[in-house]
Amino acid sequence: MSSGGLLLLLGLLTLWAELTPVSSRKRHPDCDKPPDTRICQTVVRAFYYKPSEKRCVQFRYGGCKGNGNHFKSDHLCRCECLEYR
């Protein structure tokens, strides 16, 4: 095999190794819980993962710390709860 072929093979194996962990990641179990909408402190805008729609949705979070399915931003929600297949 030529040195160019070996470099190509090495590059493909490296790419595969880098992408494999991301593609098999599962979401956190808290992402399947309903949002806690009780009011305990100041109400702030937050996001929760809605499994039936497979997306993050904005809601009013009252600071009760009911479960882990509340995030300060849509980006954080998506990073934690979206599955990568």
UniProtKB/Swiss-Prot annotation:
Heterodimer; disulfide-linked. The A chain has phospholipase A2 activity and the B chain shows homology with the basic protease inhibitors. Expressed by the venom gland. GO terms for cellular component: extracellular space. Keywords: Disulfide bond, Neurotoxin, Presynaptic neurotoxin, Secreted, Signal, Toxin. It comes from Bungarus candidus (Malayan krait). It is found in: Secreted. PANTHER family: BPTI_KUNITZ INHIBITOR DOMAIN-CONTAINING PROTEIN, KUNITZ-TYPE PROTEASE INHIBITOR-RELATED. Disulfide bonds join 31-81, 40-64, 56-77. Its main location: secreted. This is Kunitz-type serine protease inhibitor homolog beta-bungarotoxin B3 chain. InterPro entries: Kunitz_BPTI, Kunitz_BPTI_sf, Prtase_inh_Kunz-CS, TFPI/VKTCI-like. The lineage of its organism: Eukaryota, Metazoa, Chordata, Craniata, Vertebrata. One of its GO terms (molecular function) is serine-type endopeptidase inhibitor activity. Residues 31-81 form the BPTI/Kunitz inhibitor domain. Belongs to the venom Kunitz-type family.
